Amino acid sequence: ESTLINIEGLPIQGIWEDFDNDGFLDIIVAGSKHSIWRNNGDKTFTYVEAFDNNDMESFATGDLNSDGFIDVMGGYANIYTSPSDIDDVVWLNQGNSNNYLALNLTGVISNRNAIGAWIEIHGDWGVQIREVRAGESYGIMNDMKQIFGVGSSTNIDSLVIKWPSGIQTTLLDVEVNQTLNL
């Protein structure tokens, strides 16, 4: 365990995702060396051996099998965009018993993809916030579905969506382990 994260090699991409749905955002980095760092929830991170020994140059994330856990599509190149002999790989997250809430947002007055929407969930853990983005790192487009890990919590007190148009949607007493299409 370490408060400091030692990212080796030449990092090209990096984003925050909650891979274990414990409510704390983890870090994934790709480049000449890839790494995943699990957020311990106490301002420290632990390195996770998650992939094979071939270092990803690129990746995209999303819930590919709709189980509520973030999966990874790993791309292999020879620095940036030069092709390599290594096939790209999909890693399906095997998950755990932690709970989640997934959101697919579609703008009606706001832009169709809800880019710029600000989402808050409130519960016994406090507040979690996400923003719908069109891109998060160098050369990638991740799934726009927003997934909130809530650990062992079985209920979300409130869900607040602040749409780019200025409209606000609030839902109370939201059940976990579901995907809402709003």
State where each predicted segment sits.
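Conserved hydrophobic/aromatic "anchor" residues
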Residues: 1, 19, 37, 45-47, ...
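Surface loop/turn motifs at the tips and blade-to-blade linkers of beta-strand repeat domains
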Residues: 4-8, 50-53
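Signature of short aromatic-glycine-proline-rich micro-motifs recurring in repeat-based ectodomains
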Residues: 11-13
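Conserved beta-strand position repeated across blades of beta-propeller domains
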Residues: 15-17, 60
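Acidic/hydrophobic-patterned starts of short beta strands in beta-sheet-rich repeat architectures
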Residues: 21-30, 67-75
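Loop/turn residues immediately N-terminal
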Residues: 32-35
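Gly/Ser/Thr/Pro-enriched helix-cap/hinge segments flanking short amphipathic alpha-helices
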Residues: 45-60, 64-182
